[in-house]
């Protein structure tokens, strides 16, 4: 939901960029790794 996409905490799980959900992808990536986004990574 929209609120999860503005959550500024670190991702609940670390993983590859391809494993992040769509709103994470829209927020960008860090060296191809889902490390810090404005929403959580997929499990």
UniProtKB/Swiss-Prot annotation:
**Statement: the UniProt record of this protein carries the keyword Signal:** no
**What are the annotated disulfide bridges?**
5-23, 11-34, 20-39, 24-41
Principal place where this protein is found? Answer: secreted
Q: What is known of its domains?
A: The presence of a 'disulfide through disulfide knot' structurally defines this protein as a knottin. Has the CSalpha/beta fold, which comprises one or two short alpha helices connected to anti-parallel beta-sheets stabilized by three or four disulfide bonds.
Q: Which InterPro entries match?
A: Ergtoxin, Scorpion_toxin-like_sf
Instruction: Provide a Gene Ontology MF annotation, just one.
Output: toxin activity
Kindly list the places in or outside the cell where this protein is found, as annotated in its UniProt entry. Secreted
Query: For this UniProt entry, what's an example GO CC term?
Result: extracellular region
Would you say which domain of life the source belongs to?
Eukaryota
Keyword Acyltransferase listed? The answer is no
Q: What does this protein do?
A: Reversibly blocks Kv11/ERG potassium channels.
- PROSITE patterns named among the record's database cross-references: ERGTX
Q: In which tissues is it expressed?
A: Expressed by the venom gland.
For this entry, the protein name equals Potassium channel toxin gamma-KTx 4.3
The organism is Centruroides exilicauda
Q: Which Pfam families match?
A: Toxin_17
Keywords, alphabetical? Disulfide bond, Ion channel impairing toxin, Knottin, Neurotoxin, Potassium channel impairing toxin, Secreted, Toxin, Voltage-gated potassium channel impairing toxin
In which family does this protein belong, per the annotation?
A: Belongs to the ergtoxin family. Gamma-KTx 4 subfamily.
Which lineage? Eukaryota, Metazoa, Ecdysozoa, Arthropoda, Chelicerata
